UniProtKB/Swiss-Prot annotation:
It comes from the Eukaryota. GO terms for biological process: positive regulation of shoot apical meristem development. ATP binds at residues 1476-1483. Its EC number is 3.6.4.-. It comes from Arabidopsis thaliana (Mouse-ear cress). Residues 1805-1976 form the Helicase C-terminal domain. Belongs to the helicase family. This is TATA-binding protein-associated factor BTAF1.
Length: 2045
């Protein structure tokens, strides 16, 4: 079983690396976690295997491997420290001890003593950076093997070639000469001095990674409570060896600085390899990662290995290890070090001993005496006395006890404490912040003896105070033990966390790898390391938090930007994770982040801003000068940013976060009020400016007029994230101002008037140009906020900009926007040049690696001045060039915004809008009319919404002429003349009209010149100058008719007609296109004009001019957004007409309801959908929700597709109209519009209990099912938009709809099912209650197939449509579905199987959900089904199936489990394959379940019909079955009839059928008597050796599949013998359709597996094969039970298989060589390569290719291997006889000669084997003693002729003493069992000769213990079956199997083919099929759903690669160059992996 489990694990591990999608990889990772859960004993091995993938070069593989580690950790349970303390608290309470847990355990004392020895005290950043190798790329990809060539010229030539290859120049050789690019002198080594101004390559080249390992190990506690293991001792030896090498290398460097580069390379390479050996040595063998002891944290050893990998030179290995540590710490950070070992009170454990040992083992150099004051808890915060100084001289907090070459006096200790909180403010006055001027590398060791003094602290008796717990009572002793355990675990956890923290800090300091692929650098190692550090922060003691923060602050002072970047990453996760400590930490974090914000490096600035975002609320709470200085700093940074600054988005996000805080509103109000009374000097507020600079009051962060414009340049930034940040920041500023106004805190405008105009212009341009939906929606919200400003300010803006805005909005498609009317903001003035000079100085300092450290150097730098003249921008913006955004959507958004703006204006300023609107509406341009109409619609709609009381949206000052003009436009119904009294088309169509008229003129000219159409022209005159599209089409059509009439006139020239026809077709095309475009444009324009008239609420007397355009838009408008406008206006119009007489409403409602049925894809067509096959073929059962997200624009196609698209548009428009009607009328919808209810109840009748029969009659009496379907579709369309109060009324139609679910017509059933599904989405509780009560019983109605089909269809749609909302109902649906999975109807089976697959994963979720409301108690609490579901979810609770009868044998455990499984299948009417190994009792288990069922039925009074059972088996086994049943089962229960014999015998036996309840027959009999046997309905139909039906096309298979039975069971030890298609045939008998059709199965599984078998297959093919194999395994797993003898029979002797190789005899060799020269040789070779037709699984390949003689030749070869006479026969042809006579000297009779055994090496080998067994030799040995150890032998052959030869030539000639029997096909079946019984009962019979075919089926021959296979079958399972005749239950001796194989022949190929087939079979059916417990019945989804997923992922095609090969050709061309390019990096991979909110969600669980 372990081997099988390993096989599955290996496949999952392969998917981690080769999965085509990240989802595939993560799914594999999750399943690896499940393996860890089910096999906890293999944890160490599992981790080791995943560790390999953590070191992969591929990002996706490492991420998936880290997720796999997380999944493993999730499934490994270990108590955490908090759980341990909670249990201690409980015990203390039970013991009556009232002390606090902290006091009892003495944590405070523990903390103070441990901190005195904290490794942070000895952590020195300079030492880490000096001795640690910088970590960037490992550089191995650039290593070059040493060139030992003695000839310098050859060496240079080789290097030139290598360099050309690495530079890619070898690809260019065919295009240009590359020899001169690299010259010899370029490669000659030039000596140069080491650079004087930097470290050069010293840190990279000469430092082994183990320098840092050794250095860190001195600082980090390594607590070992045991003697070092052998692995650890070896590791120490390796470290010592490396250390000695490093020292030797160091001395060498001193002696010779100018050592050659080759020597340096070899040295560094040697060190690198050594370090890699040492770091990776721990994973060399499976046992290297030692399993941790019982009770200890199980990941300790694994984490040690990961920590080693953290310092690997290769960044990928560092990245993988840190990600794995992150996953472990997230989940088990609180469990690390926690021990569950028992600490008994007498085991000698004393805490002081542990602490002393800790101290001794640390080996820490302490450079100072630790005073008592410094051991106090760290809780105070520094007070900022002078903010200006504290933020400038912002230095590191020197936490107590650290010695960094600064002398700290005891009296200074009070200044070194963390800050305290004073009146809610951060008080930093007590902090001593002195700059550290130098950090040299010298470290004094003179005070090392202070270690002893510190040790004395641990000897302090007061420290080990025992709690006051009386020890007399036993329970108190238990408490005392628990206290000791808690102390020990606390110390271990504390030390582990600080160990990890130190190492994370080292990586953050040393890592230099950065990826510059995106706008902002991403440092994956540092980011992942910071996340891991964040995970430790969650569990870390506050004292450790301060220690860690101190080192992070040290890192912030370093000159290297990477270290500053890493420190701020750590701070970011600290702030995010420990929010509860934020107020205490803020005093330290703010100065560091402010310094980061002013850093010279932009990436540091970005991460500094990101770090403060989680602290925004805390920053605002500081108020005062601190808040002001931070906010002003952020605003000032915006001045310095340019287009390439990656920190832009982060800075603005932080600003937005700060301004969006609720407290910020109050702060702004207070500060502005204060600013009105006094002048504020900003420099006095703490923000220090450069020399000579001052700011005035308007730059206060609370007076935005001078600051907000700094956002303008970023609103149209090239980077999407920057644009969104800019507009989001603006929105938050406006929201803060609105809140201030609403709360009454301010009476003035919340937005400065001076910048309102510019702000509106900027936002309008965003609406005009933006294509990103998120930014566009934000811009709309900002616009609405801006128009809330005072009307006076808005009117000023309208005066200047409204006309230009309308003109911009109306710019036609393809035209350029007028840039002069747009606002290009001039960048605000930059800071002074002094800042630029400061930056240059800072950069110079950094380049020189200056030792002058501190925050001030970074602050003094700023970005260089870069003045940009915005007015010089000459960007051309073409409307429609951005294809991401619909031009129509842009027009609607901008025009609607202008309407909203206009609604705020007063009557006096209305002219600013009306004048430009008049010009657009009177224009000939359709686009301008659209824009003008939309402005009016938005304007009047806003006005009406503000004054809804009178229902009028009219404006008194709106000009009447404009209203009249709108009505005049509506009166123009002809699209060709859309303007009153003007006979011109729309301006947009003028070009197309010109083109059409030119073509018409050309055609007319051609017709006139040929004089063939003079008569036609005289009657049809065409005015080319003014012709319309309709007239043109009419003329061209008339010309076509005339042309056909004149075609018979032979005098007309053919060329003339061709010219005329060509011109005519071109003209028709142009005119048709013009007509279509013109019609669509006219519909759009007129519908918008009509909508504008509707919203004006001034209707004309006749409503037709308004109604017709609106309805036309509902039917044909392609743009959804315009259709929505028309639908809303139509609802408004209908509301107006409710009280109008006469009212058009009834007709309108009728038309709208009719239009909902126009979409054939949503409304089933009864004339088309006439059967379930059509439903399945056309995929109508996919849940296409008619209320989901619709396409924004639909492009019309042609033909059938065009009608579908038109139907879709019409339905979409009508549903939008219903939606707006519902919104308009609400609960009074049916009262105001009674016609709508009439349409809903046209056929469907509301529920009336007394009229149930009438309802049924009415529905069935409807002759036209389409009427019923249309009625149902109207209900479906209106259900989602119905107001809540009306839903009960709609629910009254449900009973009638459920009647339609079981309607006789399939289209009605489909429509009703879709309708119920749609209703369930909006009325889940009520509809699902009705489903459970009405639809579920339909599934069990065996009398109504249409009801079962409809119910299956309905549930399938519900599962797809409702998804997780179905969770509470899933327990009620699963069991009924399960019972229907074997329904006789294939469509029912298919639908319920899919539904069951989707429901099963919901069951675990349903366990914690209360039962759904609205159901009766009987329905919601079915005890029997509940118990089954519990077993399904938790298979450890499976009960043994109680047989209803007693067996005459004691069942073994595995046999009971087999009966449990059979009982499971029986209960739920499922069917399966019992495929235990041969000899495990399949017959017994099957007989037992049949007998139990018979007894159960006999005892049941309800069961009237007692059906017999039929057992079909090979004819040899008929008697065996009868014998077994009689042996184990009570004959009174099962009465057996053997239905075999001749036809006459069988006819006579039929009379006895009624007297027996078990019929045993053979496959041949079933084939012959199928007509008779199919008349019966059988209870059980059992197929023994069921693989006989593996060929789906055989007559036996066809006959067996016709048998009808309630329970179908297959017994087979080998369900897969040759190929995977055999499994399909077996399941087609069990559950037809379960694995799809044969073709679908072949595509899903057969082809991928066959492709993957090819050794040259691609990685994608290999992955597809793995996925297909895994999917098939899961699909069939619950229906296959497989146990092997090795797993379940521990007392079964082993089976030893020995292959004996023989060499061909001379005669055989001669015949073999003769064949090799024959013509059949080539064909045979090809067949062997494709594995023969049987194995390929593709019936179309080999059989058509291979001729009959080829198969005969194959048989010839196989027979020849066994014996020459098998191929020669008794008569040898003359040529062959003469050849053989020449070979054999003195041979006269060749036949007689060939009968000698030496001509068949196999006979010789057989003789040897028999003699070894003591058979055939003399009865006594030479010394007269009797031979012992007598064996009995089975000899198997494929052919009877070989058995004849063995009898005659071996036994009778040479081994006459052998006694034997024979069993082959010549023995009649009835006699075969007698021979078996005789052999088993008579030990004097030595040998039984059998053919594999006869002797391999079900026989029990355990009396034999030796088997000899003379020949071998292509099918390996036949040989295995034959072996298991002896190796089975009852065997007492070791079984020896001898396989005789001829070396170098076809037989060897047969044996290799057998291995592959066995591998496939074992993969599909493996150890997971061993029992119900291992089948993962809780994951039944995978078992069903995998069929569909594998169809998508399994059938990969090679076509793409083949096409590429053809295109690219071969050789060195473009294909070779492109082949070496990697795929572009997907930025989303970084975004997803390093998302802070996702990290926090996962961390907090």
């Amino acid at each position: 079983m372990a081997q099988q489990q390993s096989s599955r694990l290996n496949r999952l591990l392969t998917l981690l690396d080769t999965g085509s999608t990240q989802a595939t990889r993560l799914t594999a990772a999750k399943q690896i976690g499940d393996i860890a859960k089910s096999h906890p004993q293999d944890l160490s091995s599992l981790l080791r295997k995943v560790l390999h993938h953590l070191r992969s070069k591929k990002w996706d593989t490492r991420v998936a491997a880290a997720h796999a580690i997380g999944a493993i950790v999730l499934n490994v349970k270990h108590p955490s420290l908090s759980e341990l303390l909670n249990s201690l608290a409980t015990k203390l309470g039970e013991a009556g001890i009232s002390d606090n847990v902290d006091e009892v355990v003495a944590f405070r004392n523990l903390q103070s003593k441990i901190l005195a020895n904290a490794p942070f005290r000895s952590f020195e950043m300079n030492k880490v950076l000096e001795f640690g190798a910088l970590l960037a790329s490992g550089g191995q990809e650039y290593d070059i093997l040493n060139d030992n060539s003695k000839n310098p010229r050859d060496r240079v030539a080789r290097q030139k070639k290598n360099l050309r290859r690495r530079l890619g120049l070898d690809m260019c050789e065919q295009f240009m000469d590359v020899n001169e690019m690299i010259r010899d002198e370029d490669l000659i080594e030039q000596k140069s001095n080491v650079p004087a101004n930097g470290v050069g390559n010293r840190l990279y080249a000469n430092c082994s990674p183990h320098h840092i390992q050794q250095f860190v190990s001195r600082m980090v506690p390594r607590v070992n409570s045991r003697r070092p293991s052998a692995r650890e001792l070896n590791l120490l030896k390796r470290k010592a060896k490396i250390s000695s090498k490093d020292q030797a290398k160091g001395s060498c460097e001193v002696a010779d600085v100018e050592m050659s580069s080759s020597h340096v390379a070899s040295t560094s390479k040697r060190i690198l390899s050594d370090s890699l050996d040492s770091s990776k040595a721990d994973i060399g063998n499976e046992d290297d990662i030692e399993p941790d002891g019982d009770g200890k944290w199980p990941f300790h050893s694994f984490v040690e290995q990961l920590i080693l990998d953290m310092f690997d030179p290769a960044w990928e290995i560092r990245h993988g290890s840190v990600m794995a540590l992150r996953e472990i710490l997230m989940l088990h950070g609180g469990s690390a070090g926690v021990s569950t070992e028992e600490f008994s009170s007498d085991n000698g454990f004393e805490l002081k001993d542990v602490l002393n040992k800790v101290t001794r083992e640390r080996e820490i150099d302490l450079n100072m005496q630790v005073s008592e004051n410094e051991l106090e808890p760290l809780r105070k915060r520094p007070k900022i006395e002078d903010p200006s100084k504290s933020f400038i001289d912002n230095t590191v907090l020197e936490v107590i006890g650290g010695d960094y070459d600064i002398n700290v006096k005891d009296e200074d200790a009070e200044f070194l404490l963390p800050p305290v909180k004073v009146n809610g403010q951060t008080d930093c006055s007590s902090t001593k912040l002195e700059p550290q001027s130098s950090m040299d590398d010298s470290t004094s060791h003179s005070e090392i003896n202070h270690v002893a003094e510190v040790n004395n602290h641990f000897e302090d008796k007061s420290f080990i105070e025992e709690p006051v717990i009386p020890k007399q009572q036993e329970e108190n002793l238990e408490v005392l033990d628990l206290v000791k355990q808690a102390r020990h675990s606390w110390i271990k956890n504390f030390e582990f966390l600080q160990d990890c923290t130190i190492r994370f800090l080292c990586v953050l300091s040393l890592d230099r790898f950065g990826d510059y692929i995106s706008d902002q650098v991403v440092a994956p190692v540092r980011e992942a390391c910071a996340q891991a550090l964040g995970a430790t922060f969650k569990y870390m003691n506050p004292s450790l938090i301060y220690e860690t923060l101190n080192i992070l602050l040290q890192m912030q002072r370093r000159p290297e930007w990477e270290i500053r970047h890493g420190s701020l990453l750590g701070i970011k996760y600290l702030v995010a994770v420990r929010q509860e400590m934020l107020q205490d930490l803020l005093g330290y974090i703010l100065p560091a982040c402010k310094a980061g914000l002013e850093d010279s490096d932009d990436d540091v600035r970005a991460v500094a801003a990101d770090a403060l975002i989680p602290a925004a609320a805390a920053i605002v709470s500081l108020r005062g000068q601190t808040l002001l200085s931070i906010v002003m700093l952020l605003w000032d940074i915006l001045l310095e940013l340019d287009d390439l600054s990656p920190s832009t988005s982060s800075i603005m996000n932080l600003l937005a976060e700060i301004y969006s805080q609720d407290d910020m509103t109050l702060v702004m109000h207070e500060e502005l009020s204060l600013g009105e009374e006094q002048n504020i000097e900003l420099n006095e507020m703490g923000h220090i400016e450069s020399i000579g600079e001052r700011r005035d009051v308007k730059e206060s962060p609370y007076a935005l007029s001078g600051l907000a414009p700094r956002l303008w340049p970023f609103t149209r930034h090239d980077i999407t994230s920057v644009r969104f940040s800019a507009i989001r920041t603006l929105e938050r500023l406006l929201e803060a101002g609105c809140r201030k106004n609403i709360s009454g805190q301010s009476k003035s405008s919340f937005w400065p008037s001076s910048i309102l105009g510019d702000t509106l212009r900027i936002v309008f341009q965003n609406l005009l140009l933006e294509s990103t939906e998120e930014i566009l929606e934000c811009s709309e919200r900002v616009w609405r906020l801006l128009v809330q400003c005072p009307v006076d300010d808005l009117e000023d803006t309208a005066k200047f900009y409204m006309a230009s805005w309308i003109e911009l909005a109306a710019t036609p498609y393809g035209s350029t926007l007028d840039a002069t009317k747009m606002f290009w903001p001039v960048a605000p003035p930059r800071k002074s040049h002094f800042k630029a000079a400061a930056k240059m100085k800072a950069v110079k300092l950094e380049n020189e690696a200056s030792s002058i450290l501190g925050f001030d150097y970074a602050r003094s730098s700023a970005s260089l001045e870069k003045q940009e003249d915005a007015s010089a921008r000459s960007t051309k913006i073409i409307v429609g060039s951005d294809m991401e955004m619909s031009v129509t959507r842009t027009r609607v958004v901008t025009a609607s915004a202008l309407g909203i703006f206009a609604s705020r204006l007063r009557e006096g300023s209305m002219q600013f809008v009306v004048d430009p609107l008049s010009s657009t509406l009177t224009s000939m341009s359709g686009v301008q009319r659209q824009v003008g109409s939309i402005v009016l619609i938005s304007w009047f709609r806003e006005t009406k919404c503000k004054a809804p009381s009178d229902g009028s949206g009219s404006l008194p000052g709106f000009p009447s002429p404009l209203k009249k003009w709108l009505l005049d436009l509506l009166a123009c119904a002809d699209p060709a003349f859309p303007t009153k009294d003007i006979f011109l088309p729309y301006a947009e169509l003028s070009r197309t009209y010109t083109k059409m008229r030119n073509e018409a003129s050309q055609l007319l000219h051609t017709v006139e010149t040929c004089h063939c159409f003079d008569k036609l022209l005289s009657t049809n005159k065409l005015n080319v100058e003014s012709v319309t599209a309709d007239e043109t089409i009419d003329f061209a059509s008339t010309l076509d008719l005339w042309n056909k009439e004149s075609a018979g006139n032979e005098s007309l020239e053919k060329q003339v007609f061709e010219d005329v026809e060509s011109s005519r077709q071109q003209l028709l095309s142009t005119a048709g296109y013009l007509k279509c475009v013109q019609s669509n444009l006219h519909i759009t324009v007129t519908s918008l004009v009509a909508a504008a008239v509707v919203w004006m609420s001034e209707f004309p007397a006749r409503l037709n001019p308004i109604i017709l355009p609106l309805m036309a838009s509902i039917k044909r408008e392609q743009e959804q957004i315009l259709q929505q406008i028309a639908a809303e206006a139509l609802a408004e119009l209908i509301a107006y007409c409710v009280d109008r007489k006469p009212s058009p409403n009834d007709k309108l409602i009728k038309n709208i309801c009719s239009l909902t049925c126009m979409d054939p894809s949503e409304t089933p067509q009864a004339s088309i959908i006439s059967s379930m096959d059509i439903v399945d073929d056309m995929d109508f059962l996919s849940s296409r929700s008619n209320t989901g997200k619709q396409k924004a624009k639909v492009v019309l196609a042609s033909g059938e597709d065009r009608s579908k698209v038109e139907g879709f548009i019409t339905r979409r428009g009508s549903e939008l109209a219903l939606k707006h009607l519902s919104l308009k009328f609400g609960g009074s919808l049916f009262d105001k519009l009674p016609k709508l209810w009439e349409c809903l109840t046209e056929v469907l009748v509301p529920e009336i209990p007394s009229d149930q029969q009438k309802i049924d009659l009415k529905i069935e009496s409807i002759s036209d099912p389409q009427v019923l379907i249309n009625n149902i579709q109207v209900v479906r369309s209106i259900a989602p938009v119905m107001e809540e109060t009306l839903k009960p009324r709609l629910l009254s139609l449900l009973p009638c709809i459920f009647k339609c679910v079981r309607h006789s017509h399939v289209a009605v059933r489909l429509a009703a099912s879709r309708c119920v599904m749609t209703m369930a989405k909006s009325m889940t509780t009520d509809v699902m209650a009705a489903v459970v009560e009405s639809a579920i019983p339909m599934l069990g109605d065996l009398t109504c197939i249409s009801g079962r089909q409809g119910a299956g269809m309905l549930i399938g749609l519900l599962v797809q449509g409702l998804g997780v909302e179905l969770v509470p109902y899933s327990p009620l649906l699963v069991v009924p579905l399960l019972r229907c999975m074997s329904d006789v109807d294939s469509s029912v089976r298919q639908s319920v199987t899919r539904s069951f697959a989707a429901l099963v994963p919901m069951l675990p979720l349903a366990r914690g959900v209360p039962p759904p409301v609205g159901l009766s108690k009987d329905l919601s609490s079915n005890a029997e089904d509940a118990k089954f579901l519990e077993q399904l979810l938790d298979n450890s609770h499976i009960d043994d199936y109680k047989l209803c009868t007693e067996l005459k044998v004691q069942l073994r455990r595995y046999q009971q489990e087999g009966i449990n499984w059979l009982g499971f299948l029986k209960r739920f009417k499922l069917h399966g394959i019992l495929c235990d190994d041969m000899g495990l009792g399949k017959t017994l288990q099957a007989s037992a379940i049949v007998a139990s069922d018979a007894a159960e039925r006999r005892g049941s009074t309800d069961e009237l019909d007692v059906f017999p059972s039929i057992i079909v088996c090979p004819s040899t086994l008929v008697g065996h079955w009868a014998f077994e049943i009689e042996k184990y089962i009570d004959l009174s229960l099962l009465s057996v009839l053997q239905y075999v014999g001749s036809a006459q015998d069988r006819v006579s036996l039929r009379e006895q059928f009624n007297n027996h309840n078990v019929i045993i027959t053979s496959y041949d009999v079933v084939r012959k008597d199928v007509d008779y046997l199919t008349q019966f309905s059988w209870n059980y139909c059992i197929l023994d050796e069921g693989h006989i039906i593996k060929n789906a096309k055989s007559k036996i298979t066809a006959a067996v599949k016709q048998l009808k039975a309630q329970h179908r069971l297959i017994l087979s030890g080998t369900p897969i013998q040759n190929n995977i298609m055999e499994l399909w045939s077996l399941f087609d008998f069990l559950m037809p359709g379960f694995l799809g059709t044969e073709r679908q199965f072949q595509a899903s599984y057969g082809k991928p597996l066959l492709a993957a078998r090819d050794p040259k297959c691609s990685a994608k093919d290999a992955e597809a094969g793995v996925l297909a194999m895994e999917a098939l395994h899961k699909q069939v797993m619950p229906f296959l039970l497989r146990r092997t003898k090795e797993e379940v029979l521990s007392d079964l002797p082993e089976k030893i298989i020995q292959d004996r190789y023989c060499d061909l005899s001379p005669v055989q060799l001669k015949l073999y060589e003769q064949f090799s020269g024959s013509s059949a040789k080539q064909e045979i070779s090809s067949i062997i390569k494709v594995d023969g037709s049987a194995d390929s699984g593709n019936a179309d390949v080999a059989p058509t290719k291979a001729s009959t003689h080829v198969f005969q030749a194959l048989q010839y070869l196989l027979k020849l291997c066994s014996h020459p006479l098998l191929v020669l026969g008794d008569k040898v042809t003359e040529p062959v006889a003469s050849d053989l006579a020449a070979m054999i000297n003195g041979c006269s009779d060749i036949i007689t000669e060939l009968h000698k055994v030496q001509h068949s090496p196999k006979l010789v080998a057989l003789q040897e084997i028999l003699e070894e067994c003591g058979i055939g030799s003399d009865a006594s040995s030479s010394d007269g003693t009797l031979s012992v150890g007598q064996h009995r032998v089975l000899i198997f052959a494929q052919h009877k002729a070989l058995l004849d030869i063995i009898e005659k030539d071996l036994f009778q000639a040479h081994m006459k003493s052998v006694t034997y029997m024979r069993l082959d096909g010549s023995v009649v079946p009835e006699k075969r069992f007698e021979i078996v019984k005789a052999f088993n009962s008579d030990p004097t019979i030595d040998v039984l000769l059998l053919t594999t075919h006869v002797g391999g089926l079900g026989l029990n021959l355990t009396s034999a213990d030796t088997l000899v296979f003379m020949e071998h079958d292509w099918n390996p399972m036949r040989d295995h079956q034959a072996m298991d005749r002896a190796h089975r239950l009852g065997q007492k001796r070791v079984v020896n199997v001898h396989r005789l194989i001829m070396r170098g022949t076809l037989e060897e190929k047969v044996m290799s083919l057998q291995k592959f087939k066995v591998s496939v079979a074992n993969t599909v059916i493996n150890a997971e099929n061993a029992s119900m417990k291992t089948m993962n019945t809780d994951q039944l989804l995978d078992l069903f759903a995998s069929a569909e997923t594998s169809k998508k992922g399994g059938g990969s095609s090679k076509k793409g690669s083949e096409d590429n090969d053809q295109i690219a050709g071969t050789g060195k061309g473009m294909k070779a160059i492109l082949g070496n390019l990697e795929e572009l990096w997907d930025q989303s991979q970084y975004t997803e992996e390093y998302n802070l909110s996702q990290f926090l969600t996962k961390l907090n669980g």
